[in-house]
Amino acid sequence: MFGAGDEDDTDFLSPSGGARLASLFGLDQAAAGHGNEFFQYTAPKQPKKGQGTAATGNQATPKTAPATMSTPTILVATAVHAYRYTNGQYVKQGKFGAAVLGNHTAREYRILLYISQQQPVTVARIHVNFELMVRPNNYSTFYDDQRQNWSIMFESEKAAVEFNKQVCIAKCNSTSSLDAVLSQDLIVADGPAVEVGDSLEVAYTGWLFQNHVLGQVFDSTANKDKLLRLKLGSGKVIKGWEDGMLGMKKGGKRLLIVPPACAVGSEGVIGWTQATDSILVFEVEVRRVKFARDSGSDGHSVSSRDSAAPSPIPGADNLSADPVVSPPTSIPFKSGEPALRTKSNSLSEQLAINTSPDAVKAKLISRMAKMGQPMLPILPPQLDSNDSEIEDVNTLQGGGQPVVTPSVQPSLHPAHPALPQMTSQAPQPSVTGLQAPSAALMQVSSLDSHSAVSGNAQSFQPYAGMQAYAYPQASAVTSQLQPVRPLYPAPLSQPPHFQGSGDMASFLMTEARQHNTEIRMAVSKVADKMDHLMTKVEELQKHSAGNSMLIPSMSVTMETSMIMSNIQRIIQENERLKQEILEKSNRIEEQNDKISELIERNQRYVEQSNLMMEKRNNSLQTATENTQARVLHAEQEKAKVTEELAAATAQVSHLQLKMTAHQKKETELQMQLTESLKETDLLRGQLTKVQAKLSELQETSEQAQSKFKSEKQNRKQLELKVTSLEEELTDLRVEKESLEKNLSERKKKSAQERSQAEEEIDEIRKSYQEELDKLRQLLKKTRVSTDQAAAEQLSLVQAELQTQWEAKCEHLLASAKDEHLQQYQEVCAQRDAYQQKLVQLQEKCLALQAQITALTKQNEQHIKELEKNKSQMSGVEAAASDPSEKVKKIMNQVFQSLRREFELEESYNGRTILGTIMNTIKMVTLQLLNQQEQEKEESSSEEEEEKAEERPRRPSQEQSASASSGQPQAPLNRERPESPMVPSEQVVEEAVPLPPQALTTSQDGHRRKGDSEAEALSEIKDGSLPPELSCIPSHRVLGPPTSIPPEPLGPVSMDSECEESLAASPMAAKPDNPSGKVCVREVAPDGPLQESSTRLSLTSDPEEGDPLALGPESPGEPQPPQLKKDDVTSSTGPHKELSSTEAGSTVAGAALRPSHHSQRSSLSGDEEDELFKGATLKALRPKAQPEEEDEDEVSMKGRPPPTPLFGDDDDDDDIDWLG
């Protein structure tokens, strides 16, 4: 009987029309004035009429009730296109409704965006500091209570102006006292903003602000022909206009709300002179502007309202009252407001159901408005049934209604279809017998005390048959009174609200009394109806007694007796129900007393909790501001630290590369030092042998004269052999050129490979740059959120990327090292092959040299010169022994100075180590230079005296002697930055009297070997050299290295050197020397030392096996490795000492020259010319050494360290490289 209407529960409170905003606030009662169709009477012929339709009229009566303090009203509502600002751009959310809601008594105003009445989108509380930023093209932006930026576009300019105007009025209403001018842009325009001193023509309209809205219009330019002209800052208008119109632009419109304090100017008010204490509202539009500032200045005075500054953080009272899923009619909870709840809800249900206070207030207001009004409408007069049937139906409905209604649960619908405003009407008396107790019973849930009443409803079942016979609508009506379940669950994230007020207990008591009176009235009506029914039954019995027969009369009497028994039973049950109702009413009063106590206690708790929440919200706000500031600071520091880390890693890689290069330099210098020591030992042995052979040469000189004539004939034969050897030499030169071409091709290949490697490195850098850009974007995203999990994830990602970066860098470094190692091994293999060829050429040259020396040893002039210079040999021996001791002394001095700079247990940076080593080497080098300059000055003075003595005796060899004596000091004097080129005349005149074949072959072999090694090593280092450098190859012979051959300074200087040497070649070549040009291009690495050793070897006896022939140029001796170009700076010290050895050997060679003159005097002129002609022509190669030494000394200043594989080596620019 009571469970047949479950299908219609969801439609009980559904609206009849669309989702209109007016249904939220009780403005659509005019459309619902026809009553609730569920409670209309229908004839038995139409039992189901109107059951499926929606009901919207159960709250139609109080539509004229005035508004109360707890009901929000709609100030303006319109349709907008909403955009939400996410990830740096506005994303369209669709077409929403936008409304400004306000409660004037509580001074609370809000902007609401909603999709429908059940789906609110966002809420923004309007306060004095709230900013609604107006944009062109009907756009406006604001921040909601969750600090989310929204942009809304109105469909028309009129709607935008009205909405903005209501927002400004709401800002004014939200404060109790207005102290400053409030302004709100209604329409924004482009162009410069007005400032103080500008002249304006404005159109305005002024209202008085009355009862929270715009009141009477007291002045306007709409009815005037001319606009108002004014000048800002002149004082002729009120202060509110002076302040409020700053920053406006031509064509812009603004709403100004001026308090009384700002409504008077220095010279009165503009269009009205009466004094007023009201707030004035102006709508001002700028029509024309004349700027006072110059036309060239471009200053823009923009007020704060035009900026995009975010609105302030919402107050503490908004944090818990406005969840995301709150209903659109929600108003934030505020301490001091009466939080009304339904009387019949139990405490557990009140705590479990998290409804917003606005919904509870709206329901309570609707219940109070319907107090004492009929639930059922007045029946129309055209019903077919008689009065008794109507009365019986009304009796059943009136008696059954209180039984059914307690089981109806309250609806948790977020937007009630009609929210009537509270009325002050008293309960009205019932008009007819169809009045129900109260409509408020339809919206409350049952208390435990009502369960008995609902259980006793089964006592009315005997009337079911009668209802089905005459009034089938009764069951349909009761079926509609089932509990209405909520149409959507309560919001899960919303905290429970605690409400309470002082007048709640009195209100509940009055409502309980009204319920009791209504129940008593209903019971009395039931008793009256029963008495009326009894009288009718008695009349029927009397009427049918005389007219019916026995059998019908017995059936009638049986029927009436059954009816009478039922009536008696009903009367007894009615008495029992009356007693139960009295007991329950007493129990309800007790429960009401308890509820009032609990409400008072709850009120105290609510006040305390509100205070605590306010304190917590304030502390949370300060904490969040502090944390945001800290996060920003931490992010800035993080960016700085990442930049420093990148710079540090780059510097570490550079220093590691430098450290490896210096380690290689150190090992090579140590090898060179050991080899130089071995070479000094060999020179000592050779010097002792030369002394022993001097005595033998005295004996053999007598035999040399007799053999001279025979050897003269042999000389012609040897000249023929020399020509053949020269042909072989040309062939070897062709081979040399082919090998040089191969080397150049290999250099080009290495250059291409290096360029490819650099391109790969550039691509890797670009990829790393893209990864860094992505990381920066991630950093920007993480700055918005303060979630710690996101920060940890970011740190993990950064750590992984850093490890990947380091792994990739190590992998690339290893691959680059492998490539350079392979190239170095290939060049070493080529060098070994060239060395083998060089050994073969040296053997041929040595054989020829032995034959030539056998001829020249027979000259008596050498014997006489050696006898004269015996006293000078002791100085030569001492000079030869000096280099080893000096080398030891210098290295010991370097070691001791470096040892003082470092401690064994300390760790040092690579930059500091490099700088210390460079300073130490520089200091030792400068000390040696000072000593060497003194020695050079002494030796040069002695040699000049010797040259002065030899010039009258040797006119043909005057230039040769001067060049040989002066040339050894050239490398010493030119050891510092200036190193000019050696003149080609000296190269030609510095000739040793040897046959051209030996010198050509030996020097060509040395040149090839030096070429192969120097170019191979330079190819490893630089990858490619300019083609001009092929004309000046690097040479090396067995002997103490005078300098470490570096790479020339550049292609320009080498071109000039080649051009000078080639230009001097015609002067160097004699008429009978066909290979003069080639000799100019050949450069000897160790000119002075080779010259002296060659001159000493001239006196060896051919019968003794020529022990000196293999001394300086023995192919079996290991030759010192040629260092790289960047190792020049580390070899300054040993080079200086070995230069002293050259000076000593040169002195010995100069001492031998007088013997040549004596020998020449004993011979005839023709024979002498024939003997020394060819040797003089070919003597160019040994003296080309100063030119190369000059180049070496220029490069002694040091070339910068090699460019690292990764990154720019800008950090090393500040190191003064030995300069």
Swiss-Prot record:
Keywords: Acetylation, Actin-binding, Cell projection, Coiled coil, Cytoplasm, Endocytosis, Endosome, Phosphoprotein, Transport
A Pfam family that the UniProt record links to this protein: FKBP15
N6-acetyllysine sites (modified residues): K92
GO cellular component: actin cytoskeleton; early endosome; growth cone; membrane
GO molecular function ontology, one term from the record: peptidyl-prolyl cis-trans isomerase activity
Subcellular locations according to the entry: Cytoplasm; Cell projection, Axon; Early endosome
Residue ranges with Acidic residues bias: 1207-1219
Coiled-coil residues: 522-789, 818-878, 925-951
Region (Important for function in growth cone organization): 72-169
Domain-related comment: The PPIase FKBP-type domain seems to be inactive both for FK506-binding and enzymatic activity.
Assembly notes: Interacts with WIP and actin. Interacts with TBC1D23.
Protein name: FK506-binding protein 15
Gene: FKBP15
